[in-house]
Amino acid sequence: INYTSGTTSYSKGVMIPYRALWSNTQFAFDVLKMNPGDKLVSMLPMAHMYGLAFEFLYEFCVGCHIYFLTRTPSPKIIFQAFSEVKPNLVVAVPLIIEKIIKKNVLPKLETPAMKILLKVPIINDKIKATVREQMINAFGGNFYEIIVGGAAFNQEIEQFLKSIDFPYTVGYGMTECAPIICYEDWKYFKLGSCGKAAPRMEVKILSPDPENIVGEIVCKGPNVMLGYYNNPEATAEVIDKDGWLHTGDLGVMDAEGNVTIKGRSKNMLLGPSGQNIYPEEIEDKLNNMPFVSESIIIQQADSKLAALVYPDFDDAFAHGLDNDAITQAMEENRINLNTELPAYSQIARVKIYPEEFEKTPKKSIKRFLYQEVK
């Protein structure tokens, strides 16, 4: 029994059968490229299915060396561990990758001189090749690919990685599937997607036009749980009579089977005329703005949208901003963000949080704790 992360509600005990553990481990044997004696740095908690399946069970069955990171995975600690271990595969959540790139890579590319050089095609290619090599070396220089999963990946960061042909891929799964649902090798991975249905799994979108109209993602196969422990009502809500697991995630699927997630159905908000608003898409834009570490978009009692923001205080203070200046910077971000949004999803106010938002073991924000602006 493995307990869900609890991003939209409190945790439930997921009953995971042997077939699901076998299917996930066999998936890893089918598509990952590890051999006996290979190395991996384990950064994810073993109490979470993502970490248990792909940072322990698979490697244990192959005969790999697993190095457990026993400290909080800051960029400095990760770089040190990877330089010593030189892992053959990297499994991570988006937050870890995003922090490394935001802190150590993007600032160097955003200097005035570098922006000018990047406009020259030949120099641009050379700079990107150099950045790619430095990034690969930062993760030990010996891995086949980085698998990112467990939460939504920042679009700007993903576009940057794709532009330098960095060997990364984004998977999709949930505790209820122990965890894998979708995956694609980095060489064939489509930007913005989370891959295709994993071996032995079926995936479809409940939509009249799955390529263009967002619908709920449902899946079926040996990875699917038996149900929630001592909770038949909750089980019946997510597994229908035909055995399809209703994930609660919303997305589209192209003709090749690539799935793109738009957000959680429980997170979706309604605009003044019934328009669908996906807070994750707005948060993705806001998180790329100056001095923003993380954010949550919520709907207030008056139906207007508010942004809860945890600023990147270290970066702001390093640039000489005091608390009043940070507040002003967040208001400027709100104004600039609204120029990129349709009228029905404009942000009415910003509330600054002094501490990081509470998260699940896989570093997803526990959104249900922050549904009111105080």
Identify the residue ranges that each predicted region occupies.
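Flexible lysine-rich "adenylation lid" loop at the C-terminal edge of ANL adenylation domains
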Residues: 310, 353-373
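Conserved AMP-binding/adenylation subdomain of ANL enzymes
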Residues: 22-39, 46-133, 142, 167
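Active-site loops of AMP-binding adenylate-forming
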Residues: 18, 153, 162-166, 174-192, ...
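Conserved ATP-binding/catalytic segment of the ANL
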Residues: 197, 204, 211-271
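Conserved A3 ("GATE") glycine/threonine-rich loop of ANL adenylate-forming enzymes
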Residues: 95, 149-157, 170-185, 198-200, ...
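Conserved S/T- and glycine-rich ATP-binding loop of Class I adenylate-forming
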Residues: 4-7, 40, 90, 161, ...
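Conserved AMP-binding A3 loop
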Residues: 1-23
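AMP-binding/adenylate-forming catalytic core of the ANL superfamily
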Residues: 221, 226-227, 250-343
